[in-house]
């Protein structure tokens, strides 16, 4: 997805269209319910996540909202990983 986002940002940038992607980690959604409803699995994930917790849908929503404001005016071609720092502890 990173290269697609970059290519589209280059193609659409001259038309003042910004292209970014959000790459969420483990977020408390129905999709991940099996993991976050099991206290043992939740603790295992929290131990290896630098921020020490699972993500909440609001975490994604707030990032999305900020990208749609003036705060995101000069941001394009980026894939933003929002995972509580998990990727930096295990980039695989």
Regions found by a protein language model. Give the residues of each.
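A short C-terminal helix-loop "cap" of Rossmann-like NAD(P)-dependent dehydrogenase/epimerase domains
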Residues: 35-49
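Rossmann-like NAD(H)/NADP(H) cofactor-binding core
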Residues: 15, 20, 78
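A conserved structural motif in NAD(P)-dependent oxidoreductases
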Residues: 49-60, 71
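Short, flexible catalytic-loop segment of classical short-chain dehydrogenase/reductase
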Residues: 23-34
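Short-chain dehydrogenase/reductase
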Residues: 5-6, 61-64, 68
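Short C-terminal tail/terminal secondary-structure segment
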Residues: 65, 76-92
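Alpha-helical segment proximal to the catalytic Tyr-Lys
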Residues: 10-14, 73
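Conserved catalytic helix of short-chain dehydrogenase/reductases
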Residues: 1-11
């Amino acid at each position: 997805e990173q290269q697609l986002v970059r290519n589209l940002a280059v193609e659409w940038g001259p038309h003042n269209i910004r292209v970014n992607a959000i790459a969420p980690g483990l977020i408390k959604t129905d999709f991940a319910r099996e993991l976050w409803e099991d206290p043992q699995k939740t603790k295992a994930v929290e131990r290896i996540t630098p921020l020490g917790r699972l993500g909440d849908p609001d975490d994604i929503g707030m990032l999305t909202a900020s990208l749609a404001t003036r705060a995101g005016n000069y941001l394009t071609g980026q894939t933003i990983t929002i995972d509580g720092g998990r990727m930096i502890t295990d980039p695989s």
